[in-house]
């Protein structure tokens, strides 16, 4: 496929936080002919911003293309594993591994676990941008009836925070308000969800969560 792309994977993603989402130009290929396996690869060469429909050269910074490949294998309905890699030309290499596992406990009750890990390596340290980073998160959710109770932990390591431009990071504490991705940052989440189908109102749901963080390298982010 060649043309406009709205990529949605752990290493290439678009942002729809505004009325006009950003998009990319490039080419890609996907395949799901093997039962349980989805694979994809692509190269993004141009991008638009959310406040401008015109396109600029380069998927990230000027003249920097982004090449990615990876996929997800579902062993069964309860267990899947994802592996992805990406190269931002003359900028960074990034690798991702993720796993999602649901353990049925009883009728209507299950325990869901999600693990995500990113490793980003600087490809050209001469430009002054530090991007070396390892980011990991673990979330556990108890689903019982129409209720869900979850906790999550996320941690950053390396010489910098997690570098991102647009869209969602596939980490538990990356939310619309903040990604909690500063250098050395550790963050903790508590979450509750309710499905109002339990009150006879299907399609209506409620979610609340609290996230706090610590250990940020304030010298790196420029905070006194």
What residue ranges belong to the model's regions?
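Outer-membrane beta-barrel strand-turn architecture
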Residues: 31-35, 73-77, 87, 103-107, ...
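Residues on the lipid-exposed face of transmembrane beta-strands in outer-membrane beta-barrel proteins
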Residues: 27-31, 69-73, 97-101, 138-144, ...
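Repeated loop/turn-to-beta-strand initiation elements of outer-membrane beta-barrel proteins
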Residues: 1, 36-40, 48, 77-82, ...
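Transmembrane beta-strand segments that form the barrel wall of outer-membrane beta-barrel proteins
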Residues: 2-14, 39-45, 69, 77-89, ...
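Residues that define the transmembrane beta-barrel architecture of outer-membrane proteins
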Residues: 21-25, 63-67, 91-95, 132-136, ...
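Extracellular/periplasmic loop regions
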Residues: 55-56, 112-202, 217
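Outer-membrane beta-barrel domain signature
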Residues: 13-18, 52-62, 70, 84-89, ...
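Gram-negative outer-membrane beta-barrel proteins
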Residues: 8-14, 47-51, 77, 89-93, ...
